Amino acid sequence: MIVGIGIDVVYIPRILNLWKKFGNKFLKKVFSQEEIKDSNKYTSCEGKARHFAKRFAAKEAYVKALGTGFGKSIKMSDITTYNTLHGKPQITVKKSNIDYKAELSLSDDTDYAIAFIILHKES
């Protein structure tokens, strides 16, 4: 049973500008250690910015699907987006008692990144 659907679009240069302005402080506030470490596979700032923009969009889409937004119960850095060995994007949330499965799709083109997520319960 579907319990929520979320979508978010991020302007990649916005993420790059925030990263340049606030550096590691921005990264640590928004992204998990795993996401930051995973960005090291990209050699260019643009590649890293695309990586971070897709993950930013995924976090926003996730809380939209939940219908809660961010707050005391869930922070951006509590959410980790990663890819399986076959490249499928996955999402996990630490400190969460929510038992939903997530189907996540990420994409980017030119200056935009997008995330689409469906949360569902196992029947």
Curated annotation (Swiss-Prot):
One of its GO terms (cellular component) is cytosol. It catalyses: apo-[ACP] + CoA = holo-[ACP] + adenosine 3',5'-bisphosphate + H(+). GO terms for biological process: fatty acid biosynthetic process; lysine biosynthetic process via aminoadipic acid. Keywords: Cytoplasm, Fatty acid biosynthesis, Fatty acid metabolism, Lipid biosynthesis, Lipid metabolism, Magnesium, Metal-binding, Transferase. Its main location: cytoplasm. GO terms for molecular function: holo-[acyl-carrier-protein] synthase activity; magnesium ion binding. It is found in: Cytoplasm. Its EC number is 2.7.8.7. Mg(2+) binds at residues 8, 60. InterPro entries: 4-PPantetheinyl_Trfase_dom (IPR008278), 4-PPantetheinyl_Trfase_dom_sf (IPR037143), ACPS (IPR002582), P-Pant_transferase_sf (IPR050559), Ppantetheine-prot_Trfase_dom (IPR004568). It holds the Pfam family ACPS. Its cofactor is Mg(2+). Belongs to the P-Pant transferase superfamily. AcpS family. Transfers the 4'-phosphopantetheine moiety from coenzyme A to a Ser of acyl-carrier-protein. NCBIfam families: acpS (TIGR00516), pantethn_trn (TIGR00556), PRK14659.1 (NF011253). This is Holo-[acyl-carrier-protein] synthase. The gene is acpS.
